[in-house]
Curated annotation (Swiss-Prot):
<keyword id="KW-0521">NADP</keyword>
<dbReference type="InterPro" id="IPR046346">
    <property type="entry name" value="Aminoacid_DH-like_N_sf"/>
</dbReference>
<dbReference type="GO" id="GO:0005829">
    <property type="term" value="C:cytosol"/>
</dbReference>
<dbReference type="InterPro" id="IPR020630">
    <property type="entry name" value="THF_DH/CycHdrlase_cat_dom"/>
</dbReference>
<feature type="binding site">
    <location>
        <begin position="168"/>
        <end position="170"/>
    </location>
    <ligand>
        <name>NADP(+)</name>
    </ligand>
</feature>
<dbReference type="GO" id="GO:0006164">
    <property type="term" value="P:purine nucleotide biosynthetic process"/>
</dbReference>
<comment type="similarity">
    <text>Belongs to the tetrahydrofolate dehydrogenase/cyclohydrolase family.</text>
</comment>
<protein>
    <recommendedName>
        <fullName>Bifunctional protein FolD</fullName>
        <ecNumber>1.5.1.5</ecNumber>
        <ecNumber>3.5.4.9</ecNumber>
    </recommendedName>
</protein>
<dbReference type="InterPro" id="IPR000672">
    <property type="entry name" value="THF_DH/CycHdrlase"/>
</dbReference>
<keyword id="KW-0368">Histidine biosynthesis</keyword>
<feature type="binding site">
    <location>
        <position position="236"/>
    </location>
    <ligand>
        <name>NADP(+)</name>
    </ligand>
</feature>
<keyword id="KW-0378">Hydrolase</keyword>
<comment type="subunit">
    <text>Homodimer.</text>
</comment>
<keyword id="KW-0554">One-carbon metabolism</keyword>
<dbReference type="Pfam" id="PF00763">
    <property type="entry name" value="THF_DHG_CYH"/>
</dbReference>
<comment type="pathway">
    <text>One-carbon metabolism; tetrahydrofolate interconversion.</text>
</comment>
<keyword id="KW-0658">Purine biosynthesis</keyword>
Length: 286
């Protein structure tokens, strides 16, 4: 009932299209004796992290990528985590891998991520690869920003010349998305908004595209959106009742031209481009 006005940016259908392409590419790699492998490092018993990792390995099975799991207890030392990362760096069966976050508080997340071999960085978030993105050099791209750009293009939302308001400056979405969108291949103008941004509604009402990645429930309301604009909902948080909700209020569907559902919008593409990064790495090694 709330989705009458806007076209749905359907991430699930778009993911399925990507999977068809990946299956064909993985089959060619397998025929050449180079089946790619995705590894995950999971520390502790967080139910959300376990569910997310299960989903990643289920995706691997769908396209023919080998799965490698390293599940570790919550009380491991930094040294044991480092040894696990070093083992995957040296493992020829592992084309790319991720360290599932968050880690237990006694472990140094930044040190763990920096220890990953940048060429095996499936998330595209190693400092070296983010630096290559700044320089517009080839490197694994951050999965969620790449998924956002792909989703907009898939539904023919004009990016070149568009004013994009990005809400949130996190390292996984906001900051790298601004870098992607301002490349010559995208040619957007980006306003990166955060907690100290003044006059936010005025900024968003001027935007052709809004990407909400702040993690604030329903912060983007209908009065903040220019009629016909595209709105991408990336944020995930819980409301007062404990229900998972996005950053975009349901009323936005009556005003915007395109809206991504949450869930079912960007999330499926984040996982799809995790696999894409691994396949691209395997193809580069042929």
């Amino acid at each position: 009932m709330m989705r009458v006005g806007a076209i749905t940016l359907d991430g699930k259908a778009t993911r399925d299209e990507i999977f068809v392409d990946l299956r064909e590419r993985v089959a060619r790699l397998a025929a050449a004796g180079r089946t790619p492998g995705l590894a995950t490092v999971l520390v502790g018993d967080d139910p959300g992290s376990h569910a997310y990792v299960r989903g990643k390995h289920a995706d691997c099975a769908k396209v023919g990528i080998n799965s490698i799991r390293r599940d570790l207890p919550a009380d491991i030392s930094q040294a044991v985590l480092d040894e696990t990362i070093d083992e995957l760096n040296a493992n020829p069966e592992c084309t790319g891998y991720i360290v599932q976050l968050p880690l237990p508080k006694h472990l140094n997340e930044n040190a763990a991520l920096e220890r990953i071999d940048p060429s095996k960085d499936a998330d595209g978030l190693h400092p070296t690869n983010l630096g290559r993105l700044v320089l517009n050099e080839p490197a694994p791209l951050p999965c969620t920003p790449r998924g956002i750009v792909h989703l907009l293009r898939r539904f023919e939302v004009e990016i070149a010349g568009a004013h994009v308001a990005v809400l949130g400056r996190g390292v996984t979405v906001g900051r790298p998305l601004g870098l992607l969108l301002t490349r010559r291949s995208e040619n957007a103008t980006v306003t990166l908004c955060h907690t100290a941004t003044r006059h936010l509604p005025e900024i968003t009402r001027e935007a052709d595209i809004i990407v909400a990645a702040a993690g604030v429930p329903h912060m983007v309301t209908a009065d903040m959106v220019r009629p016909g604009a595209a709105v991408v909902d990336v944020g995930v948080s819980r409301d007062d009742a404990g229900k998972l909700v996005g950053d975009v209020h349901p009323g936005v569907w009556d005003v915007a031209g395109h809206v991504s559902p949450n869930p079912g919008g960007v999330g499926p593409l984040t996982r799809a481009f995790l696999l894409t990064n691994v396949v691209e790495r395997a193809e580069a090694n042929l």
